[in-house]
UniProtKB/Swiss-Prot annotation:
Lineage: Bacteria, Bacillati, Cyanobacteriota, Cyanophyceae, Oscillatoriophycideae
Residues binding Fe cation, per UniProt: 111, 115, 312
Example GO BP: tRNA threonylcarbamoyladenosine modification
Species assigned in the record: Trichodesmium erythraeum (strain IMS101)
Cofactor binding note from Swiss-Prot or TrEMBL: Binds 1 Fe(2+) ion per subunit.
Protein location: Cytoplasm
A Pfam entry, by short name: TsaD
Name of the protein in question: tRNA N6-adenosine threonylcarbamoyltransferase
Gene from which this protein is expressed: tsaD
EC number: 2.3.1.234
InterPro entries: ATPase_NBD, Gcp-like_dom, KAE1/TsaD, TsaD
Entry function: Required for the formation of a threonylcarbamoyl group on adenosine at position 37 (t(6)A37) in tRNAs that read codons beginning with adenine. Is involved in the transfer of the threonylcarbamoyl moiety of threonylcarbamoyl-AMP (TC-AMP) to the N6 group of A37, together with TsaE and TsaB. TsaD likely plays a direct catalytic role in this reaction.
Length: 325
């Protein structure tokens, strides 16, 4: 199998891609950010209806941009879990229907497996075994990739995901949704050492801390209390103010350092020389800087997906369909 049609509708992006080997011939992404930003987050029912309205035109556009037709397609893949149930149903129904009509083999693809494979699209030297730091709006995990389709979760968040923490802190700072890009932008102009914020740690029953697990709820609460203190002192938090930029920078620095420290420790403990990053937070500039510096001192390698493959997209689902199945 060399050429696949892939569909991704797990949350608020309707994406259809055609992938040949590791070459992305088309990758259509219809974002719903402008719709959901009004509500401060994704509304599941609204997301499902939007997917339903544009899925057919996204499929047609993918074929046009790839300059292919159905006889050129060898198989179909679609995200099957995890995600919003109604949103997933739209993509799965479309994919399965097309598979029946055009007599193409169909495979359901796990969304997180897609993020793991996203790095393959732009980093052909990536081969198992390696450690994947998967950081998104719904998940934060350290995954030992032993082989294609063979995984072991070594660490994960015990509460909020990293991307979710970015969204919640952005809401506290009145920056809107989604929080990741705007915090990253403001942090570049702020002082990352302005505020001391706690790095989340998971205590073990016998004492000490879990070396690979994450926690962001305490950090989020610390930012909330900091914002309340500033407002009680009569200061208004504005998106362009220096204090808002400093909070954004301090928060982002704390998250990036925590993610980096655990990823490096995990890779060293398991004798894994390569760390691959996946998920929307993989686009964060501070995380990329911290990891790039850290691997140099430990003789490790870190590989990032292209920025266009960090957020949800069907190309990564197509890559799983080709490489992993």
């Amino acid at each position: 199998m060399t050429t696949v049609l892939a569909i991704e509708t797990s949350c608020d992006e309707t994406s259809v891609a055609i992938v040949k080997n590791r070459q992305v011939l088309s990758n259509i992404v219809k974002s719903q950010i402008n719709i959901h930003s009004f509500y401060g987050g994704v509304v599941p029912e609204v997301a499902s209806r939007q997917h339903l309205e544009i899925i057919n035109q996204a499929i047609a556009q993918a074929f046009r941009e790839a300059n292919l037709d159905w006889p050129d397609i060898d198989g179909i893949g679609a995200t099957c879990a995890p995600g919003l149930v109604g949103a997933l149903l739209v993509g799965l129904t479309a994919a399965k229907t097309l598979a029946i009509v055009h007599e193409k083999p169909f495979v359901g693809v796990h969304h997180l497996e897609g993020h793991i494979y996203a790095t393959y699209l732009s980093q052909p030297e990536l081969v198992p075994p390696f450690l994947c730091l998967l950081v998104s709006g719904g998940h934060t995990s350290l995954i030992y990739v032993k082989n294609c389709g063979e995984y072991e979760t070594l660490g994960q968040t015990r509460d909020d995901a990293a991307g979710e923490a970015f969204d919640k802190v952005a809401r506290l700072l009145k920056l809107g949704y989604p929080g990741g890009p705007v915090i990253d932008k403001l942090a570049a102009e702020g002082n990352k050492l302005a505020f001391s914020l706690p790095e989340g740690k998971i205590s073990l029953p016998g004492g000490g801390y879990h070396p690979y697990d994450f926690s962001f709820s305490g950090l989020k609460t610390a930012v909330l209390r900091l914002v309340q203190k500033i407002e009680q002192e009569g200061n208004e938090l504005l998106s362009g103010s220096s204090v808002t930029k400093d909070i954004a920078a301090s928060f982002q620095e704390t998250v990036a350092k925590g993610l980096t420290k655990r990823a490096i420790a995990c890779a060293l403990d398991y004798s894994l020389n390569t760390i691959a990053i996946g998920g929307g937070v993989a686009a964060n500039s501070s995380l990329r800087q911290h990891l790039s510096r850290a691997v140099e001192s430990h003789n490790l390698q870190v590989l990032f997906p292209s920025l266009r493959f960090c957020t949800d997209n069907a190309a990564m689902i197509g890559c799983v369909r080709l490489v992993g199945h």
